[in-house]
């Protein structure tokens, strides 16, 4: 009995070694022994089997981002700020600032590059700068939370709005448009021309509409002819009284 059990176990091991490679594993790896698979943690086996081990590259920060050691705007002009301890400087720097303050500083930096008057917020180029900062913030958020449908919708809506503003700025002031695109590092793409594919249903519907229009015009013309004939017959009846049916038949013959 023991010898038979040992032979069965040895045959199972030889089958596991000579097993062909499994196509589901990434990299075309071969199936290992059951003992080796048991030694591995279950999370690694699931990741390899389901293909979840691949990670997307994280988006790098923009070149125009301020350094994290930069102080906040409210503390930059404070006298004696250079003598403050490093821990305090870190607390009032951009490294510990919230998202709203970071976006505000990025917006001010881009405004100083693009807009002549930094306090101007109503011009097209200023609105484009504000939308660009918002779009980059949405892109960073989408890199971390790829299933956030609400922010994805906000991102697409902001891109469409900026595209429309760039189109208007290009029509009104082309030099400012070039400067804005160059400083912000964006590229304006022309919208595709409208093209509707002609098919049999559309052609048949158009022909039917033309035919109906012609028939309606023909009926209107006949009604006008009958009215004029009736008016003429009424005038003649006052002079020479006749039956109205005979006058109407004569008018129809004249129109035909």
Curated annotation (Swiss-Prot):
Keywords: Mitochondrion, Ribonucleoprotein, Ribosomal protein, Transit peptide. The keyword Electron transport does not apply. The keyword Ribosomal protein applies. Pfam families: Ribosomal_S15 (PF00312). Disulfide bonds: none annotated. One of its GO terms (molecular function) is structural constituent of ribosome. Residues 227-239 have a biased composition (Low complexity). Residues 226-256 are annotated as: Disordered. GO terms for biological process: mitochondrial translation. Residues 245-256 have a biased composition (Basic and acidic residues). Component of the mitochondrial ribosome small subunit (28S) which comprises a 12S rRNA and about 30 distinct proteins. Interacts with METTL17. Belongs to the universal ribosomal protein uS15 family. This is Small ribosomal subunit protein uS15m. It comes from Bos taurus. The gene is MRPS15.
């Amino acid at each position: 009995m023991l010898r038979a059990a040992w032979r069965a176990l040895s045959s199972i091991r030889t089958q596991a070694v000579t097993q062909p490679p499994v196509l589901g594993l990434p990299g075309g790896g071969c199936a290992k022994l059951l003992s080796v698979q048991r030694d591995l943690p279950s999370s690694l086996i699931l990741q390899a089997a389901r293909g979840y081990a691949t990670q997307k590259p994280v988006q790098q920060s923009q070149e125009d981002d301020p350094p994290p050691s930069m102080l906040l705007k409210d503390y930059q002009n404070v006298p004696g700020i250079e003598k403050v301890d490093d821990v305090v400087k870190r607390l009032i720097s951009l490294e510990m600032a919230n998202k709203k303050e970071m976006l505000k500083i990025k917006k001010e930096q881009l405004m100083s590059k693009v807009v002549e008057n930094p306090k101007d917020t109503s011009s097209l180029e200023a609105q484009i700068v504000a939308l660009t900062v918002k779009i980059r913030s949405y892109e960073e958020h989408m890199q971390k939370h790829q299933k956030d449908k609400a922010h994805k919708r906000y991102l697409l809506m902001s891109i469409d709005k900026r595209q429309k503003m760039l189109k208007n700025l290009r029509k009104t002031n082309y030099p400012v448009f070039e400067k804005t695109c160059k400083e912000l590092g964006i590229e304006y793409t022309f919208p595709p021309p409208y093209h509707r594919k002609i098919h049999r249903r559309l052609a048949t519907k158009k022909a039917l509409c033309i035919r109906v229009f012609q028939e309606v015009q023909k009926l209107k013309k006949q009604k006008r002819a009958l009215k004029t004939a009736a008016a003429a017959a009424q005038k003649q009846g006052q002079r020479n009284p006749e039956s109205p049916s005979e006058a109407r038949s004569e008018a129809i013959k004249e129109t035909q």
